[in-house]
Amino acid sequence: MVLPSSLNFPRWLRDNQHRLQPPVCNCVFQEGEDFQIMVVGGPNSRTDFHINPTEEWFYQVKGRMLLRMADPQTHEITDEYIEEGGMLLLPALTPHSPNRFADTVGLVIERKRGGQKEAMRWYCEQCGRVVHERWFVCESLDRDLVPIINEYKASEELRTCGHCGHLNPTAYSA
């Protein structure tokens, strides 16, 4: 067995800033058998809500972020700002939309899901109903997540609420 050695996070961040690009701005920093640690930069302006079958731990290294959370039963959305130095443990299956501002950095630790399905969900900004939802197995953020986000952004049909007819935007504005 090869024992791990420490990494210099500020140096890693400086050398890998180019990897934190929109729309997700996310890069796996370290991964083990059970957990993965992701570095997430900004800005992004996601309108999707991610539904993860496992808990996620957020730590804000630099700046602040907005974590939009939807109640799994009522779909009521709550906005929680995580300030620099702040942390939050998000319960499993809580729809959430991590919105990050320019020149910010955060860490997210989550359990590896090993074939479990997760979802991307969009809510209508007018009436709060679910506009679109896509369940999938995520093996790679770039390969699996980005195409789902881009498909939604490119389709007025997917962004139009079937209940109230509102055409939802492709970017969140606070």
Question: Where are the predicted features?
Answer:
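Jelly-roll (double-stranded beta-helix
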Residues: 1-59, 64-87, 95-174
